[in-house]
Each structure stands twice: as structure tokens, then as C-alpha cells.
Amino acid sequence: VRAAAAQGCRVLVSTDHLTLPASMDPRCECQVPARDLPAHQAAFDAARELAAEIAPDMDFIFGFECDWYPGCEHNVAKWAQNAQVKLGSVPWIGAAGDISIAAGEHGCDRIDPADAPGLAAGWIDYSEDMHIWEELGANGVWRAYVDAWCAACESPLAFDSMAHPDLPMRFSQDGWSAPTNVESLWDEMAACAHDTNRRIELSTASLRKGLPDYYPATGLLERFFKAGVSITIGSDAHIASDICFGILEAQKHAFAAGYR
């Protein structure tokens, strides 16, 4: 909150990663565990009081980044019921296994991991475990990702914006280049976002990951514009120093793509 106030931020949305099933994140490494949801809400409420004191003109909004996976609708509705903003994201591809028990809950130790090698499922943005890339190759990951992303757009979940739409670009500078037919995949994504009336996020996080372009890449952003898809702009900050990172430049970039 203090960092956002210092940057002159007008709208700050808290979007920590929502609770996940034990099958996907058994060690609770990338989520707010179900047991911690009340404490997380309390921490936000305390921060909102601070925001009202030091930045009364800033809108501070409670939300979550909600990972889409097959069958997630009930879980997301339950765990994100207090969220004013829900970012939709697709960092996982493939089946998610038994999603009935949240990570850290009683009985979670009996749940088999859904990302075991050979299952063609797992996280596509986790640099410490690249087995899904090694199993499917870049072409396979991209194909599965676009299918999953479109399924997320088509889901009944009320995602307010689809975060970092071309997330597989994450490792494009590390030997996993986008496939030669990526433009046809972009066409699919733009058409799907239009047909499902979804917004997409223009994210500056990619620049902090060493990529030469934003999420989404310029070619995809231009397709979203031509398809009449609205955008939000965010920094996806995980630490205070990244709050509002590159936002003004991203606004200019969106303007160059046609957005007003």
C-alpha cells in the first residue's frame, strides 16, 4: 500500500493466488491455503484502513488470481466468494486429478499428485520443474495451453480479466521458442476472447522475466484490439518494489496497438 501510494497509483487490486487442490500444489507453494483465507482477508482489511489514511484517492480492491483447471468452478466459487475482482489465469495444463480436497486440509496426504511425469499435466511457468515442456515440447505445450485458455474463457466463472494471456512465452528465451504457427494460435485466442466477452490483461511482468515484449506479445495484443477485446493493465507485482512497474510505458504500448 505504501509503495502504491508513493507511485501515485489510482487503483490497486490485491490478487494473491487462490487456494488450490492438494493434487496440484501439495506443499502450498503458490497459493493462499484454505486455512489461511480468514487471516488473508483480515490482513487486507488492515491494509485497506492504512490505504484510507495515506492514499484516500486510491481504490484498494480485494481479489484473487484464480487458476483455471478442469472442474475448478465449484472450488473457485467457494474459495473466492469474497473477492471483488477475479483474475483468470491458466498456468496449468492437463488433468488436475482429485480436486476435492484443498492443499493442507485433512486427508490431503492421500491425494496423488496430478503432475507426475508421464501424465502430460503440470505447471507451465515453473522453472524448477520443466517436465511438461520436456514431455510435450513447445508445440505441444502451446496447443494444450490455447485449448485450456479458451476453455477458461468459456467457463461460467466471472473472471474480470484474463491474466498474462500468452504465458507460454515465459520460456521463449530459454530454448522453448513459440511454435511457427503461433499466429494461428493467437487468432484462436482473439476470437475466443471476443466470443466470450472476456477482458484480457496487458502485463508488464514479462519484462521482469527477461522477455523482450509484454504479456501478451504485440502481435496478440493487436489481434485482441482488432477483435474488440477490452484490456486491463497491471504489473503483477509480487514484491512492493514492483508495484506499478512499467505501467505508463504499457499504456503507451496499448495506445500504439490502437487502444484508447
Describe the role of every protein-language-model region.
Residues 18-21, 94-96, 169-171, 206-208:
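Feature marks short, surface-exposed loop/turn motifs that line or immediately flank catalytic pockets
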Residues 6, 154-155, 225-228:
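Short hydrophobic "helix-edge" motifs at membrane interfaces and signal-peptide entry regions
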Residues 9, 83, 157-159, 229, ...:
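A structural motif
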Residues 1-70, 75, 171-173, 177-180, ...:
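An N-terminally biased module of ancient metal coordination in phosphate/nucleic-acid-related enzymes
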Residues 35-195:
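Extended substrate/RNA-proximal surfaces in nucleic-acid metabolism proteins
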Residues 11-16, 61-65, 87-90, 160-163, ...:
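Active-site neighborhood of phospho(di)ester-bond hydrolases with catalytic His/Asp-centered motifs
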